[in-house]
């Protein structure tokens, strides 16, 4: 396998993994621990 193909596949997998983790953090179980700055600052 060529080096360029390996690097392309590696970067693609890394990007998909980071995106999946970000979505899980934003909408999954850990999202209950996130604070909402708009709720904290009510006028």
From Swiss-Prot:
Is-annotated flag, keyword Glycosyltransferase? Answer: no
Key word Cell membrane present: no
- Entry-linked InterPro entries: PSII_PsbN (IPR003398)
Question: Any one Gene Ontology biological process term?
Answer: photosynthesis
Which residues pair up as cystines?
A: none
Q: List the membrane topology term(s).
A: Single-pass membrane protein
- Where is the protein found, in the record's own terms? Plastid, Chloroplast thylakoid membrane
User: What UniProt keywords apply to this chain's record, in alphabetical order?
Assistant: Chloroplast, Membrane, Plastid, Thylakoid, Transmembrane, Transmembrane helix
- Extract one GO cellular component term from the record: chloroplast thylakoid membrane
Please indicate which superkingdom the organism of origin belongs to: Eukaryota
Instruction: Write one Pfam family the protein is assigned to.
Output: PsbN
What's its job? May play a role in photosystem I and II biogenesis.
Concerning its family, UniProt says: Belongs to the PsbN family.
- What name goes with this protein? Protein PsbN
Species this protein is from: Chara vulgaris
């Amino acid at each position: 396998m060529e080096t360029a193909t390996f690097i392309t596949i590696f970067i693609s997998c890394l990007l998909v993994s980071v995106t999946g983790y970000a979505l899980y953090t934003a909408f999954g179980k850990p999202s209950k621990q996130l604070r909402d700055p708009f709720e904290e600052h009510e006028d």
